[in-house]
From Swiss-Prot:
Gene Ontology molecular function: rRNA binding
Protein name: Small ribosomal subunit protein uS19
Recorded name of the encoding gene: rpsS
Superkingdom per UniProt: Bacteria
Record has Ribosomal protein as a keyword: yes
Keyword NADP: no
Keywords: Ribonucleoprotein, Ribosomal protein, RNA-binding, rRNA-binding
Function statement: Protein S19 forms a complex with S13 that binds strongly to the 16S ribosomal RNA.
Organism, scientific name: Clover yellow edge phytoplasma
A GO cellular component entry from the record: ribonucleoprotein complex
Family: Belongs to the universal ribosomal protein uS19 family.
Amino acid sequence: GHAKKDKKIQKK
């Protein structure tokens, strides 16, 4: 999982 990247993109 990529929490850091997930927070930056957050496009789900």
